[in-house]
Amino acid sequence: MAEVSTLFWDNGGVILTNGWDRDARKKAVETFHLDWADFEDRHELMLDAFEKGEIALDEYLRRTIFYRERAFAVEEFREFMFDWSQPFPESLDFLGRLARQRKYAMAALNNESLEINEYRIQKFHLRDYFEAFFSSCYLRLRKPGAEIYTKALKITQCEPSECILIDDRELNLECARELGMKTIQFKNVAQLRDELKRFGVATDGN
């Protein structure tokens, strides 16, 4: 078995809450008294471009929410979106301990829109943990498409067999495995620690 050199981490559902998922959108509908079917239909049409960084947050909101007059301001809705992001303290603590060992290259590999991604990087000090951010909004590619994994491997110059992808969604992991990457489906920190150890990743002190 090839020795592990690089850990790729999903963000939402692993170290943080999801940035703008179905639960967040349902809460927005409830909070701002929106029509779910209309909003969700517009969201689905804009999602690919939004997460690939092809449109800005303001345009996404103009197309999905503010295509007509509302009783609330754009800034109020933006603030709601950003406030939805919250940390998983145990995950961040474990991530920090691994990063401080400096035994492995650590990188984010996530789907996220530009403004929410950069808010999360800044708010939760993710530069302290990750050396690189292979985010959909920067690469203009999304998981589970094979190209985003291939691009990350080429940029890092890593062999798939020496990399582990940690993600909470099985489909994302399936596609990575097809390229030869090792994978762990995240459920909790204790389970992650055990599975990393099985791959030979040193987690001493964690």
Where are these regions (language model features)?
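Asp-based, Mg2+/Mn2+-dependent phosphohydrolase catalytic module
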Residues: 1-4, 113-114, 118-206
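Active-site neighborhood of HAD-like aspartate-dependent phosphohydrolases
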Residues: 2-42, 178-179
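Generic structural signal for small/hydrophobic residues in well-ordered secondary structure
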Residues: 10-13, 53, 98, 108, ...
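Alpha-helical elements of Rossmann-like donor-binding domains used by nucleotide-donor carbohydrate transfer enzymes
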Residues: 23, 27, 45, 59, ...
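Short, surface-exposed acidic
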Residues: 32-43, 69-80, 201-206
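A metal-dependent, Asp-based hydrolase signature
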Residues: 48-78
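Short, acidic loop-to-helix structural element flanking the phosphoryl-transfer center
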Residues: 66, 75-107, 118, 146, ...
